[in-house]
Amino acid sequence: MRCPYCGSEDTQVKDSRPAEDNTSIRRRRICPDCGGRFTTFERVQLRELMVIKKTGRKVLFDRDKLVRSFEIALRKRPVDRDRIERAVSGIVRRLESSGETEISSEQIGLQVLEALKSLDDVAFVRYASVYRDFSHAEDFENVITEINAKIARDPLDP
């Protein structure tokens, strides 16, 4: 594993243990060259998922992009990184275990909304406003009501 501080290729694992969600291994590493310490996570990838965008274009699912979406919605909100990681891991686990190799971006968006609703109401509204491209104040009320109804019915069925 490359050191994120100095770029050295030779880092050592000092501690390994299951992460809180039991879907990954948390490893504490140290770089013998610069003394930098950092944490990595190792996960099982069950299958490669393709995301079907609104335009019909297909792209490889990117877990990091999902994490960034949560981080943007939760910016300056009092939500621990561990809770974000558990939410993302839960979504990825559901997607991978669904049996599908292709999933629409809308289905992923609904799962993100469902997770954000339980994490932070403000983040939920932030994400919904971008997800549904709000242009008027009324859009906030209308779309949140609609999304809540969809999530209550079935979070996997848009």
UniProtKB/Swiss-Prot annotation:
Zinc finger regions (unnamed), where?
3-34
Question: Which co-factor is required?
Answer: Zn(2+)
Q: Which UniProt keywords apply?
A: ATP-binding, DNA-binding, Metal-binding, Nucleotide-binding, Repressor, Transcription, Transcription regulation, Zinc, Zinc-finger
Q: Relay the cofactor remark from the entry.
A: Binds 1 zinc ion.
Annotated region Disordered: where?
1-22
Q: InterPro entries given for it?
A: ATP-cone_dom, NrdR-like_N, RNR_NrdR-like
GO aspect biological process, one term: negative regulation of DNA-templated transcription
Q: Where is the ATP-cone domain?
A: 49-139
Where is this chain compositionally biased, Basic and acidic residues type? Answer: 11-22
UniProt GO molecular function: ATP binding; DNA binding; zinc ion binding
Q: What does this protein do?
A: Negatively regulates transcription of bacterial ribonucleotide reductase nrd genes and operons by binding to NrdR-boxes.
HAMAP family assigned: NrdR (MF_00440)
Please give the family membership noted in the entry.
Answer: Belongs to the NrdR family.
Q: What is this protein called?
A: Transcriptional repressor NrdR
Record gene name: nrdR
